[in-house]
């Protein structure tokens, strides 16, 4: 395959996919510190959202934007550029033993999530060929797509496609190591926000900013030495985070992940339309799982304080859970306006993140790094449910016409890994789809409880903390563990028809023929290193 450069309009801002080393099985997650763990009841604390009233309901879906937005930056593009071959398999796949989990589901149901739909509420999803036509339009709440495309199937930002790829991409190429968690599942795409659009000034004043992304960047994790020929050492965040400057001269930081903030000035997307979309999915039974790698972060101002948009989302996720939809959300990333919850009292956080705040009905996902530790950018909180890989991410190149992958972006001329809780959440959403395939009689809340109960619990009181919740997900355990109440919940085994392609009998010998069937064991006999070419990406970003 050839590598391409993906361009997003602004000179000096680019994203590039480069070399990634093949990784073996990594160590389990390090034990979290004893401080800042959940302590007793949260009643009356800032960490607990005010309960819904009986009459609270989500807003009625209007099917489109609640404001008039205008494109300010051209969509992600590709152009012929460098050609870089890599030896590669994403570390997160090995860490989570996804191949083994997929084999279990396939043997039981005949597919790997083929009877499931996952709704992706994000920046839209490009119909990449590795989806094999399994992406359908949910709607567009930003603007009418270019060239008459169906709503939700344009990804100007290059974020939603990467999220959806982790859930359901299927390269169908043995030379490619990357694969989605549920590669037979269908994606229902809703474009709900975009940093390439802004409110049209002629249509009214902009929405006050309540959660800006960070202004800094971060260095790639140690050991990531893959660079494009003649490239610089990565020192900047992916452009989604607003890090870096042309020429890479801006001050960089190393504790930030990808932020997709709602209600940020100069971008498109509000909590109101997020709530509308959640209701749309629940009312129309559009999907059994929702992934939201978008959030709204604000300062915690005291017990009982909740904003109108937050209340609408709270009502919407309750509405969806009551109608048997599993709701998965990214826990959020540290930014200049979303400080880490590292205060002494875990029940009085500095930052409140929506939708994760509503943990009674949402499975919130924190991020770990490739060493098994908590990613520094992952926002802590009593609402964190589980954790999953969120660094050195590899997924589909979102540029229109691309047939490859991306694992790095460039801001200010410097390559940086794709990372964030945005990309940890789809691992969990994919596992939720597999659990729904294996256990079709479980309702949405029972699916969440199974994922939490089978996670790798941290060494903390009650088996959970504010960093990784109940722990890093364990897909194999989520699919196979015997839990109370499991009788009758497991999908019936799918009969397997064996083809009788035996050679003709040897009439000249009376010696019995013994046919030995060799199966795969639980151990890894050898690591097959795949060799393929990554795509490079360039993203347009406006100067600030």
What is the predicted function of each stretch?
Residues 1-38, 517-536:
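Secretory targeting and sorting signals
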Residues 31-115, 129-130:
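Protease zymogen maturation seam
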Residues 102-137, 149-270, 288, 361, ...:
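Subtilisin-like serine protease catalytic core
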Residues 106, 168-172, 192-195, 279-286, ...:
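Sec-exported extracytoplasmic/periplasmic mature domains
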Residues 123-127, 141-143, 172-173, 193-197, ...:
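Solvent-exposed loop/turn segments at secondary-structure junctions
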Residues 197-354, 416-419, 423:
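Substrate-binding/access-modulating region of protease and related hydrolase catalytic domains
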Residues 353-437:
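Extracellular S/T/G-rich loop segment that most often corresponds to the catalytic His/Ser-adjacent loop
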Residues 439-542:
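C-terminal subdomain of the subtilisin-like protease fold in secreted/lumenal serine endopeptidases
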């Amino acid at each position: 395959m050839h590598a391409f450069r993906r361009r997003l309009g602004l000179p000096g801002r680019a994203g590039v996919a480069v070399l990634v080393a093949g990784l073996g099985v990594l160590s389990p997650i390090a034990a979290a510190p004893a401080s800042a763990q959940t302590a007793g009841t949260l009643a009356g604390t800032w960490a607990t959202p005010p309960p819904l009233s009986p009459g609270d309901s989500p807003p009625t879906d209007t099917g489109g934007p609640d404001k008039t937005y205008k494109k300010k930056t051209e969509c992600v593009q590709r152009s012929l550029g460098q050609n870089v071959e890599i030896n590669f398999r994403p570390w997160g796949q090995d860490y989570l033993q996804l191949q083994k989990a997929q084999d279990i589901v396939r043997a039981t149901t005949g597919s790997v999530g083929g009877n499931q739909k996952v709704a992706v509420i994000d920046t839209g999803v490009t119909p990449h060929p590795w989806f094999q036509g399994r992406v359908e339009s949910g709607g567009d709440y930003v603007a009418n797509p270019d060239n008459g495309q169906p709503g939700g199937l344009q990804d100007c930002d290059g974020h939603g496609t990467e999220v959806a790829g982790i859930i359901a991409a299927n390269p169908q190429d043995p030379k490619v190591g990357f694969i989605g968690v549920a590669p037979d599942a269908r994606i229902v795409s809703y474009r709900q926000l975009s940093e390439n659009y802004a409110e049209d000034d002629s249509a009214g004043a902009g929405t006050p900013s309540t959660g800006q992304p960070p202004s800094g960047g971060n260095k790639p994790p140690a050991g990531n030495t893959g660079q494009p020929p003649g490239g610089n050492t990565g020192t900047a965040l992916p452009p989604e985070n607003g890090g870096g400057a042309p020429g890479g001269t801006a001050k960089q930081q190393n504790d930030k992940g990808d932020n997709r903030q709602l209600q940020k000035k100069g971008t498109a997307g509000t909590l109101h339309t997020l709530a509308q979309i959640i209701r749309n999915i629940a009312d129309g039974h559009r999907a059994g799982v929702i992934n939201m790698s978008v959030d709204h972060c604000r300062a915690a101002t005291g017990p009982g304080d909740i904003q109108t948009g937050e209340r609408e989302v709270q009502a919407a996720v309750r509405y969806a859970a009551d109608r048997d939809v599993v709701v998965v959300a990214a826990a959020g990333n540290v930014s200049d306006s979303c400080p880490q919850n590292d205060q002494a009292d875990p029940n009085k956080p500095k930052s409140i993140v929506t939708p994760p705040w509503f943990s009674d009905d949402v499975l919130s996902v924190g991020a770990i790094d490739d060493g098994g530790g908590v990613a520094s950018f992952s926002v802590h909180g009593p609402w964190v449910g589980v954790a999953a890989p969120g660094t050195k991410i590899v997924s589909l190149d979102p540029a229109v016409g691309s047939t490859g992958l991306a694992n790095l972006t460039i801001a200010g001329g410097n390559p940086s890994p794709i990372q964030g809780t945005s990309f940890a959440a789809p691992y969990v959403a994919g596992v939720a789809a597999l659990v729904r395939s294996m256990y079709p009689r479980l309702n949405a809340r029972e699916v969440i409880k199974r994922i939490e109960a089978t996670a790798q619990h941290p060494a903390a009181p009650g088996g959970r903390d504010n960093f990784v919740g109940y722990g890093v997900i364990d897909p194999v355990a989520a699919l196979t563990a015997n839990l109370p109440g499991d009788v009758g919940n497991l999908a019936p085994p799918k009969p397997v028809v064996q083809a009788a392609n035996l050679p003709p009998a040897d009439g000249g010998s009376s010696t019995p023929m013994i046919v030995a069937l060799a199966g795969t064991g639980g151990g890894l006999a050898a690591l097959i290193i795949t060799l393929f070419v990554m795509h490079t990406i360039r993203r347009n970003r406006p100067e600030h």
